[in-house]
């Protein structure tokens, strides 16, 4: 009495995941999604908001207070603008994660091009800062004589031209990834790998590692070694707090894990890592390290501002004059002791809300 019909064998297939993983190659294993769409939305919005605030504040302080009469400030301004360019695609990727609506293919290419151009311009800005810092230290006043502001502007223009040219493969050949039968331009896929051809994958991965990690690391090591040879012990202690060295060092630390995992993922066939388990863990590691690397654009301006805390607080007090009228209330009667004679300059207050004692 049962009314049913038997479907032909070729009408449907039953997919068993274990059989799929056992019988499929490493390129066919579904990539893991480390973050849910809601988490991608929160991450992109948070990084964009913090990075926008930090970099706009850095640009404002550089233009209004510090001025652009020396090369260091010009290069720091170029670095902040590069960070903003790197941040621009994040709101669009957040919208894609929230609503599932991807922008057009042309818009995706532009966003990916901006993202890559901003990253490469940051690398060149860090290198310019390192080289200029070394020249000022080694040549003294001669560096400012032979290197003018116009030369710095030309160097920044050339840096942007090179960054744009190097990002052309990402923007021209970019193809949004396929998700649920739809092409999706979203955060997560390495955007410098626009196509899946093995040769292009190797070439673009090598380009990314050389430009973002190997080249700036080499310049960083050379500059540090040359500075150490020319410095006394006291000067070395101060040198560790120079913004150019600190910012570049933190940049390399945040991008080194991503580039390392990326190298293993791209060349896994040649490193005996092509099994399903290794591929899965490599894909997950790429996503995790990409999150860490993306947040560097929020850290750079904070380091630049906080390494010179006294000047930064002075600029903030000039921006918000009412903060100067807030009386300081000591919680435990802790007061600043007067400086002793013959022991150098007194320590300046870097905040009207906090005081500390000069300990000799």
UniProtKB/Swiss-Prot annotation:
Keyword match Transmembrane helix: yes
Topology within the bilayer: Multi-pass membrane protein
Keyword field: Cell membrane, Disulfide bond, G-protein coupled receptor, Glycoprotein, Membrane, Receptor, Transducer, Transmembrane, Transmembrane helix
Tissue: Expressed in macrophages, astrocytes, in glial cells. Constitutively expressed by mast cells. Detected in bronchial epithelium in OVA-induced airway inflammation. Up-regulated during dendritic cell (DC) maturation.
Extracellular-side positions: 1-42, 95-109, 163-202, 265-285
Effect of deleting the gene: No visible phenotype. Deficient-mice have normal numbers of mast cells in all tissues analyzed. Wild-type and deficient mice develop marked local inflammation when sensitized with a high dose of DNP-specific IgE, however deficient mice have significantly reduced IgE-dependent passive cutaneous anaphylaxis (PCA) reactions when lower sensitizing dose is used. Deficient-mice show normal recruitment of circulating DC into the lung, but a defective trafficking of antigen-loaded lung DC to mediastinal lymph nodes.
Topological domain ranges for the Cytoplasmic compartment: 64-73, 131-141, 224-243, 308-360
Listed transmembrane segments: 43-63, 74-94, 110-130, 142-162, 203-223, 244-264, 286-307
Primary subcellular site in the record, as a coarse category: membrane
Induction: By bacterial lipopolysaccharide in astrocytes.
Glycosylation sites: 3, 105
Annotated Gene Ontology cellular component terms: plasma membrane
Keyword Cell membrane: yes
Bridged cysteine pairs (disulfide): 108-185
InterPro entries: CCR1-9-like, Chemokine_rcpt, GPCR_Rhodpsn, GPCR_Rhodpsn_7TM
Top-level lineage group: Eukaryota
GO molecular function: C-C chemokine receptor activity; chemokine receptor binding
GO BP annotation list: chemotaxis; inflammatory response
Protein role: Receptor for CCL19 and chemerin/RARRES2. Does not appear to be a signaling receptor, but may have a role in modulating chemokine-triggered immune responses by capturing and internalizing CCL19 or by presenting RARRES2 ligand to CMKLR1, a functional signaling receptor. Plays a critical role for the development of Th2 responses.
Miscellaneous field: It was initially reported that CCRL2 responds functionally to CCL2, CCL5, CCL7, and CCL8 via intracellular calcium mobilization and transwell chemotaxis although no evidence for a direct ligand-receptor interaction was provided in this report. These results are now controversial and other studies failed to confirm CCRL2 recognition and transwell chemotaxis of these chemokines or a series of other CC- and CXC-chemokines using CCRL2-transfected cells.
UniProt domain comment: Lacks the conserved DRYLAIV motif in the second intracellular loop that is required for signaling of functional chemokine receptors.
Protein name: C-C chemokine receptor-like 2
Gene name per UniProt: Ccrl2
